[in-house]
Amino acid sequence: VISRLDRGDFKIVGVAEKDDYLREHNGLRDKLDPNLFYADLGEMLDKTHPEAVIVYEPIYDHLRVVEACAPRGIHVMVEKPLAVNNEHATRMASLAREKNILLLTNYETTWYNTNHEAFRLIDSGAIGKIDRINVYDGHQGPFEINCGKEFTDWLTDPVLNGGGAVIDFGCYGANLATRLMKDEKPLSVYAVLRQNKPNLYPKVDDDATIIVEYPSATVQIMGSWCWPMGRKDMHIYGDKGYIYQDTPKEMRIYTNGKERQEIAPSLNAPYNDSFYFLKAAVRKEIDVPPTDLSSLENNLMVVRILDAAIQ
């Protein structure tokens, strides 16, 4: 948000932050009128009348924000995942549909050129019928990469975040798999949640392996705070070939007995950026189909998968 203000892509009309310290000490303070900061979300909404609200809060508080915004007809985009559990997600979806607001979920990987090129190739039949998807997401750990205390305090809390790595990084694979499997309902979800570093993360898992079974495919989601490096990549196997989504721009494709490396074509606005996408969706310049990575339908399934993994 801070980096985009100077570009004029959007106008911030208010910031609600219930934590007194964070409200007074954040990067937006140097960019915005102090009068735009509020301790109470409802007061901010009633005084500023925003078109949409972007939520950077503990996952547990996503429901609270939707409960405030939906009755006022204000669209919402939350950071991944949609909710801490299925109970919260169902309540949020009910409010959004009843009040006819958009409820979108943002993932970094939604804007990767390679993911969308993979979708296009698969939809064209390039690798045949999908039978296996392996998704790898994570990094060395929140403390290890020096995330701020204001973030790690809730990220490592089983109530506020809903879990550890299983939520933080398992959601990416569930989101992508749901899109690749065209919103098909899984047959089963099996998971192994580990604490490899209990001295650092005593309350939550730091490594999660989730196996999601579909009628014709197996998805293995590996979300971890124990990788030796940061990664967000995916391997998709079909009966005629495979696609390795290596980076946001680079991919390997195996068809007709040969592997080739490609740079995925750039995405066009507004499908290349969360803020452009939100603006276009709110102003009804684009539709958000149920199969979209940001859609409510996709992300309800994501929460169901994560809920099953934790249980």
Regions found by a protein language model. Give the residues of each.
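N-terminal Rossmann-like dinucleotide-binding module
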Residues: V1-L32
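C-terminal helix-rich "cap/oligomerization" subdomain common to oxidoreductases
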Residues: D9, A52-V55, F277-Q311
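Predominantly a Rossmann-like dinucleotide-binding segment in NAD(P)-dependent oxidoreductases
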Residues: T110-L200
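Hydrophobic residues in well-ordered beta-strands that form the structural core
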Residues: V78, L103-T105, Q245
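Beta-loop-alpha module in the N-terminal Rossmann-like domain of NAD(P)-dependent dehydrogenases
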Residues: L32-L95
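Contiguous beta-strand/loop segments that form the cofactor/metal-binding neighborhood of enzyme cores
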Residues: G173-E250, Y276-V288, A308-A309
